[in-house]
Amino acid sequence: VRFSDRVLGNAKKFAKQAKILQFDVDAAEINKNIRVDAAVIGDLKEILKRINAELPQLGHEAWIAHILDYKVKYPLTYQEPGLTGPYLVEEIYRQTDGDAIIVTEVGQHQMWAAQYYKYKNPRTFLSSGGLGTMGYGLGAAIGAQVANPGKQVINIAGDGCFRMNMNEIATAVRQKLPLIEVIVNNHVLGMVRQWQDLFYEKRYSATVLDDGVDYVKLAEAMGATGYRATTRETFNEALKAALAAKTPVVIDCVIGCDDKVWPMVAPGADISTAFTGE
């Protein structure tokens, strides 16, 4: 969506073997951060309709097979015991058999949801990508549930994101929507804290949220069912109960504040220098 540091890394090394075509509604963004080979200014929805009509439809079978082979050879793993972000996402996949619509907020939980849930069907992962829109997920989950009343919708949120738009739990209750809100509660703004931990000598600023907010009571105050999970066993039980419920459920999942998302690229580096934390 934007040629920012999160997308480019080292701008001088970005996609050196590719032809770059930039679409943007704002002409001022063209060639702003990188030089492109061609540009189209206008509404992306209309532009893509025209391009799809002109281009041959490619299946990219060889490339997809190559990526699937990499996933087998180099699977994502984690060794941390107890309740962790990756475990939460994997358990959601196990109990839903990959048939849920997964929505995310923004942060570490967003990355874990992309990495550890095995998506079987198109249009079942709703995320704002790199836009950084904390608070997006709950409203998007409500919309997804209204549009798909026969599907299970689960919003995976960090505790920081839940605070941004948690009042919409009351909307879900009022509309009798059986969505599930899974709060990955590490008591910090995890993505920013990870950067502070790795690149700023653990000088933590404005990222600690350990102020005793009780998300279970907040959920109950708005008419939803609330559970708190501190172990794998209690999360498994809470999720099973939530999936059987016919009304909104909030599960407050307490995890450690030092869990990291891997791999990652350091600020100003390029994708070839991504590191895994090992």
Regions found by a protein language model. Give the residues of each.
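Glycine-rich, acidic loop regions that bind phosphate or pyrophosphate groups
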Residues: 1-66
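Glycine/aspartate-rich loop-and-adjacent alpha/beta segment that forms the canonical ThDP
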Residues: 6-7, 11, 232-278
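Short coil/turn connectors at secondary-structure junctions
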Residues: 16-19, 35-36, 97-100, 120-123, ...
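Short beta-alpha connecting loops at secondary-structure transitions
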Residues: 30-38, 123-127, 164, 193-207, ...
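Thiamine diphosphate
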Residues: 2-3, 111-189
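Active-site diphosphate/adenylate-binding microenvironment
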Residues: 68-144
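Conserved thiamine diphosphate
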Residues: 38, 47, 53, 197-238
